A protein has these predicted regions:
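Helix-to-loop junctions at the C-terminal end of transmembrane segments
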Residues: 64-78, 165, 267-279, 363
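A late C-terminal transmembrane helix in Major Facilitator Superfamily
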Residues: 335-365
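Helix-loop boundary and gating motifs at the non-cytosolic
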Residues: 5-59, 231-242
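Hydrophobic core of transmembrane alpha-helices in multi-pass small-molecule transporters
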Residues: 23, 104-121, 225, 306-320
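C-terminal transmembrane helical hairpin of 12-TM major facilitator-type secondary transporters
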Residues: 267, 281-325
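Structural signature of the two symmetry-related core transmembrane helices
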Residues: 81-95, 178, 282-297, 376
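Intracellular juxtamembrane helix-capping segments at the cytosolic ends
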Residues: 118-133, 320-333
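Juxtamembrane intracellular "pre-TM" segments in multi-pass secondary transporters
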Residues: 1-12, 193-223
Length: 392
């Protein structure tokens, strides 16, 4: 494996810039997302129905905008300029939320700015893949270390978000997020490289080959949506399941999430290290096997000790699919890293939308335990689908 460090320079400054940019954008996002429902309820005085509608519209807008942008990002323009534009939209969005309490403004202009801002992260990973390929670096390990920065950001961001919002107010929270995006703009402008485009795979007629026309890409997308539906159902339902059904302390939910997020980081790095030797498909199947054990354990065990122990399987599941899953899309769509990365992130967003509907319906009609039995079945289905995707 080609090292990320060189003999001439102990640390590659471009590598550090990618790490810093992904971490800071991740922290800025992790500052805003965890307390958004609280902000809408307390500051905007939105009813629960309008809070749910905001999240749904926001997710759908993010999918639509990212698909439209990704279609053009691989064929024209400077990808770094696009990232700068998206970060500028994120900066404006943070300022809007800091000083506006009008629901209609937030669900229209705010959602539009948020959708444009959400493109920044997949485009940074696409630029990183192009840089790694051009400079003959190990793309898998490079992307895995970058993805670990996001996990680290989500270890730090949520507790900091609640601390800022509850102790200093939401204006301070969103101003801090805006400041982080401003620093990111300067960092990206002066440190990230512009990388010449690779030629995308073409179909007869001279047009780029759509990922949807590829059976393996379609199958992997459906499998990825299924995986992220499982994960999001767990995130939504777990705090309620622990406190209402199991009667365990509410603070345990935060401890479980923090433990899993912390364990994901070494899992991602190990997956990146062994990806070339083991193969991406085999790693994804290992992740899904861990996911199957995780959801089966949630359905069958109820003690605090068991739930903590199960987080190891959860970390293996999410730690691998979050990093290797994205790289698998990129390898299946050569020359189109922007579209491939966006397809991966859209599978996450689609899973989030489906999970919200499914979790609410199941838990209300059949109880919280039904959510985990369904997640188990979906994980098995995702395993079967992933096993049929080409190993590249």
């Amino acid at each position: 494996m080609k090292s990320l460090l060189t003999r001439k320079r102990r640390i590659n400054p471009v590598f550090l810039a990618f790490m810093a940019a992904s971490f800071m954008i991740g922290v800025a996002g992790a500052l805003q997302a965890p307390t958004l429902s609280l902000f809408l309820t307390r500051e905007v005085q939105a009813r629960p129905l309008w809070v749910g509608l905001f999240f749904t519209v926001n997710a759908i807008a993010g999918i639509v905008v990212s698909m439209l942008v990704a279609k053009r990002s691989d064929s024209r323009g400077d990808r770094r300029t696009l990232i700068l534009f998206c970060c500028a939209m994120a900066f404006c969005n943070a300022l809007l939320f800091a000083f506006t309490r009008h629901y209609l403004t937030l669900i229209t202009l705010g959602v539009l700015l948020s959708a444009l801002a959400s493109v920044s992260m997949p485009q940074i990973f696409a630029l990183a893949r192009e840089y790694a390929d051009q400079s003959a670096r190990e793309a898998v390990m490079f992307s895995s270390v970058m993805r670990a920065q996001l996990s680290l950001a989500w270890v730090i961001g949520p507790p900091l978000s609640f601390a800022l919002a509850l102790n200093f107010g939401f204006v301070t929270l969103f101003l801090v997020a805006a400041a982080l995006f401003l620093v990111c703009i300067l960092l990206i402008k002066f440190t990230l490289p512009s990388v010449p485009r690779a030629e995308p795979l073409m179909r007869s007629g001279g047009m780029p080959l759509s990922g949807w026309r590829d059976r393996d890409v379609r199958l992997l997308f459906i499998a990825s949506v299924t995986m992220w539906t499982c994960n999001t159902m767990y995130i939504i339902d777990m705090p309620l399941y622990i406190s209402v059904t199991l009667g365990l302390p509410e603070k345990l939910a935060g401890l479980l999430m923090g433990t899993a997020a912390g364990l994901e980081i070494p899992v991602m790095l190990l997956a990146g290290h062994y990806a070339k030797r083991v193969g991406k498909r085999n790693l994804m199947l290992l992740a899904l096997a861990a996911g199957i054990l995780f959801y089966a354990g949630l359905a069958m065990f109820a003690s605090q000790t068991a739930l903590m122990a199960l987080q190891l399987f959860n970390a293996v599941f999410i730690g691998i699919i979050a990093g290797i899953g994205m790289l698998w899309f990129q390898d299946l769509m050569p020359g189109r890293p922007g579209a491939a990365t966006t397809m991966f992130t859209n599978s996450i967003s689609t899973g989030m939308i489906l999970a919200g509907v499914i979790q609410g319906t199941l838990s209300e009609r059949f109880g919280h335990i039904a959510v985990y039995w369904l997640a188990l079945g979906l994980a098995v289905a995702a395993f079967a689908m992933s096993a049929r995707v080409k190993n590249v």
